[in-house]
């Protein structure tokens, strides 16, 4: 039963979500947000790296998924988001995990059926698929959505291998 850590990187808040099982029978393990302190950006990246390293040690996933960067109108924001992604990827690779990356559109397509779904639709599907009592916070929900997308992709790849394709 694969266990996947999904990460929705951010320069102020990074969402995480751990799921296990299969694309057709996923189970919620943990989710939440890493809130980064104010202060020098390199210090915030260190906090993010350490927090994710602790989550990796605690939950022991078999793979990680990091949402890809969207194009921003603000170059400084895009650079900071890219650096946060880098800290997240380094934490995962340092723990020996393979890291998959999906665009927001690919994640929405896997969960909702079309790549232009709204945040509310994605949150609803995360809640339904994982049988949660409430819709998770947006950043944690996005991370869970990324992990669910990867479970779905892993199921599809396994089916193709079994079919000899």
Swiss-Prot record:
Its cofactor is Mg(2+). It catalyses: Endonucleolytic cleavage at a junction such as a reciprocal single-stranded crossover between two homologous DNA duplexes (Holliday junction). GO terms for molecular function: crossover junction DNA endonuclease activity; DNA binding; magnesium ion binding. Binds 2 Mg(2+) ion per subunit. Its EC number is 3.1.21.10. Keywords: Cytoplasm, DNA damage, DNA recombination, DNA repair, DNA-binding, Endonuclease, Hydrolase, Magnesium, Metal-binding, Nuclease. Mg(2+) 2 binds at residue 67. The active site is at 8, 67, 139. Mg(2+) 1 binds at residues 8, 139. The keyword Signal does not apply. Its main location: cytoplasm. GO terms for cellular component: cytoplasm; Holliday junction resolvase complex. It is found in: Cytoplasm. It is an enzyme of class 3 (hydrolase). Belongs to the RuvC family. NCBIfam families: ruvC. Homodimer which binds Holliday junction (HJ) DNA. The HJ becomes 2-fold symmetrical on binding to RuvC with unstacked arms; it has a different conformation from HJ DNA in complex with RuvA. In the full resolvosome a probable DNA-RuvA(4)-RuvB(12)-RuvC(2) complex forms which resolves the HJ. The RuvA-RuvB-RuvC complex processes Holliday junction (HJ) DNA during genetic recombination and DNA repair. Endonuclease that resolves HJ intermediates. Cleaves cruciform DNA by making single-stranded nicks across the HJ at symmetrical positions within the homologous arms, yielding a 5'-phosphate and a 3'-hydroxyl group; requires a central core of homology in the junction. The consensus cleavage sequence is 5'-(A/T)TT(C/G)-3'. Cleavage occurs on the 3'-side of the TT dinucleotide at the point of strand exchange. This is Crossover junction endodeoxyribonuclease RuvC.
